[in-house]
A protein has these predicted regions:
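Conserved binding/catalytic microenvironments
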Residues: 1-163
Length: 163
């Protein structure tokens, strides 16, 4: 709850939703505009679910290099297992090998559901001197039908079966 309140203070709902829609949900632009990290913006995007002012219903997941899930949020459906790891064909895992790049992917699950995914490697803001600097991959996604609203999803077609 404390994290939600902090995010709401840093990225107030109405201005953030308007900016998200105007930028095509461009996470880097939103991070710069609101003075937040890529991960904070991705998390905030999952909270834009007010009945009178909804954003794209995103899910967000954060994994480490071993595939351990350390964060999982969704404003709508969440297409992946609640327990255990994630499919290695999902480019979420590739993001760790390509820091600084935002990767996109259209994925198709075994049941035929199609999703659009954005993945990026992120680091912690502050790490004590001498400590290892952990890197995580953050995945942000939505049902494929919403991909046209995203700057990343315009023209996305090629599918990768995952699951």
């Amino acid at each position: 709850l404390l994290n939600y309140v902090a995010a709401a203070a840093l990225m107030p709902y109405a201005p953030f939703l308007t900016a998200a829609q105007e930028t095509g949900y461009d996470v880097d632009v939103l991070a710069a505009r609101f003075g937040a990290s890529w991960e904070q913006v991705a998390h905030r995007l999952t909270t834009l679910a007010r009945p009178s002012a909804r954003g794209v219903p995103f899910f967000m997941i954060r994994v480490d290099a071993a595939g351990n899930v350390s964060k999982r949020f969704a404003s709508g459906a969440f297409p992946f297992a609640r327990m255990g790891g994630t499919c290695p064909r999902w480019n979420l895992h590739e993001a760790l090998a390509r820091p600084g790049q935002t990767l996109t992917q259209v994925i198709e699950l075994p049941g035929g559901a199609r999703w659009f995914s954005i993945a990026r490697a992120v680091r912690r803001f502050a790490v004590p001197w001498g400590e290892p600097e952990p890197m995580f991959a953050v995945g942000l996604g939505c049902e494929l039908k919403h991909a046209g609203a995203l700057v990343y999803g315009r023209g996305a077609k090629d599918m990768t079966p995952v699951g």
